[in-house]
A protein has these predicted regions:
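Start-transfer (signal-anchor) and selected internal transmembrane alpha helices
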Residues: 1-22
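Active-site lumenal/periplasmic loops and adjacent helix-entry segments of GT-C-fold
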Residues: 16-167
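Short hydrophobic alpha-helices at membrane interfaces in multi-pass membrane enzymes
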Residues: 164-177
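Generic structural signal for short, solvent-exposed loop/turn connectors between secondary structure elements
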Residues: 6, 10, 46-49, 171
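Membrane-interfacial loop-to-transmembrane alpha-helix junctions, especially the N-terminal start
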Residues: 6-8, 118-124, 173-176
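Short intrinsically disordered, low-complexity coil segments enriched in acidic
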Residues: 1-3, 59, 175-177
Length: 177
């Protein structure tokens, strides 16, 4: 059973890396909204984590907080600061893109494996969550290619919320809060 689970894990990880390498390439994404997202990360690192803090390049906050929540910039800043600057801001941004890419698939795989009891049964759903676009703001096309990275990260967190509630729903005595 454990050998079969390792095969499932390797198939999933291999597909995620292969597709991600083709989609994200080897360099920094520099089109659509990515330059602005990289700027937001530089802003979080150099000016501070408060996205509404006065900065002449921050566009007064309105559309920024509505369409570009600061979660992706905060994650990149956390990676940069946790490495004590060893991971530069552009590399931290690439790491955020890879996390945003794989998180929906991995989280869905974990949830479905828990619910269905089989990694093989969970694999198709995880592939759909990993590669789905269908004009979703958090899909591969808009979430990664266009640069709506925080939306993609949010999409990846949803299955983790459900996974955290499974034991409670199945009759545990209290909510996991």
């Amino acid at each position: 059973r454990y050998a079969a689970q390792r095969v499932v894990n390797r198939v999933g990880v291999g597909a995620g890396i292969a597709f991600g390498r083709a989609a994200l390439g080897g360099g920094l994404l520099a089109f659509d909204d990515h330059p602005g997202q990289l700027y937001r990360l530089y802003h979080a690192v150099n000016v501070g984590w408060a996205p509404w803090r006065l900065n002449p390049g921050w566009w007064a906050g309105y559309a920024e907080l509505q369409y570009y929540p600061p979660g992706a910039a905060w994650l990149g800043a956390a990676i940069h600061q946790a490495s004590m600057g060893a991971v530069g801001v552009p590399a931290a941004y690439q790491a955020v893109l890879w996390i945003a890419w794989v998180l929906p698939g991995m989280a869905t795989f974990a949830l479905l494996t828990r619910l269905l009891g089989s990694g093989w049964l969970a694999l198709p759903g995880a592939f759909i969550a990993l590669t789905l676009s269908a004009e979703s703001r958090s899909g591969v096309e808009e979430g990664l290619r266009w640069g709506l990275v925080a939306a993609r990260l949010g999409w990846g967190l949803l299955p983790l919320v459900a996974l955290s509630l499974v034991n409670w729903v199945e009759g545990s005595r209290r909510a996991p809060l």
